Amino acid sequence: MLFNSVDFLIFFPIVTLIYFLIPHKIRYIWLLVCSYYFYMCWNAQYALLLFASTFITWLSGIAIDNAAKKEEGTDRTRSKGIVAISLVLNLTLLFFFKYANFTIENLNALLADTGVTIRVPKLDLLLPVGISFYIFQALSYTIDVYRGDVQVERNLLRYMVFVSFFPQLVAGPIERSSRLLGQFYEKHRFSFDRMVQGLMLMLWGYFQKMVVADRLSVLVDQVFNYSSYYQGFTILIGALFFAVQVYCDFAGYSTIAVGAAQIMGFDLMENFHQPYFATSVADFWRRWHISLSTWFRDYLYIPLGGNRNGKWAKYRNIMIVFLTSGLWHGANWTYVIWGGLNGLYQVIGAQTKKLRAGCRRLFGVRENTGSGRLLATVITFLLVAFSWIFFRAATLEDALTVIRQLFSSFNPWVLFDGTLYTLGLSMVDFWIGVLAILTIFAVDLLHEKNVRIRQWVLEQNWMFRWVLYFVALFVILIFGFYGPNYDAAQFIYFQF
């Protein structure tokens, strides 16, 4: 069941209505039933995997809490052992379903290179939707209980709804128990203002997904799937469009999730904060997929030592985090290269800080001026967009083909001679896409300037507000892309 499906538009109002009608004491049970139904709409069997990860981490939390009461002083051997078992079991589940065939493919390639004729057969597995998201959310609970950051949850059903809460189950945000778990104890009363604010968020998310991301995907697919036929600026447009597509696709999902949860009285974390207005790659990763970035910061980067042991240890830790992040995104070397490239950008950025400051002085560019920030933002966007080539390409060979074709010709005339209208989008759809992109960046710019758009809308008279809401709805219905290549299942981050 996808957010941009008719099924969800029927499912969500029914769930919300019943949620507010039934007694507070059983609301979390209702949410649990609905969340598991939501997940089982993809594949009912994989609900067992969701439950397995949930039960392991719930039981681990209780065992850690019990062990902590018996441990003396700083000796936490038993608790550490329980955490280790929880990590191993959950990561084994993740490895088996997500990385087993990737490992087999690479093993077979290695055997072939060494002349061995034996081949390991691949497993007949489908990747469970959202497995990386809910396993990371569940693991954070185990670790937080061990650290003493949260109290143990002994109610299994309430913990199950924390892990499986349907708005953020399959593509985040990856919530922490310290933020979300306690909200299932709160007595949420229906709030008309919260409903309106949540609906505004959902409309904006649907605009990002259906008007922008789905439209751009047609041109992007054409360019990347047949990259050997295109050159220069045609490839450049495809790469830049993908940078916007992946942002609007994922941010759109997160925005819908936050809005849906808000309607029911729950507050989920912000997952994107104007990432394409970042002035460095490090700044970009403080703004992009914030729930995952902070997860890796708190549970991998800092435990590795963070920046405490000198710059080279810091650089090593950055590379470990981003290589791991790349692998988290997918079982493909393209994702590993993408992650490594983003880590390398940051290492090079830190190492060349003085050199770049000297260059700015030489050319009279001040870092904190508007022109200085604009230059840094454009450079950061281009670096990130280049790395997205590896993220989008099906194989390393395809990625290298795209890069080779990108620099193979200087042909700016394709921007004006109609070539861009032969890439799957008509001239009208192409320019609707461009206007939609400008709208996305204009809204992000206002947010960057601390303009609270939703608050401003709520301060207007009721007639203006509701006209605006219906205009937004009709824009999505009229300009949402429903062409021959449209597939409601194509939320990019569902594959992770």
Language-model segments: residues:
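Membrane-embedded transmembrane alpha-helical bundles that form the catalytic cores
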Residues: 1-495
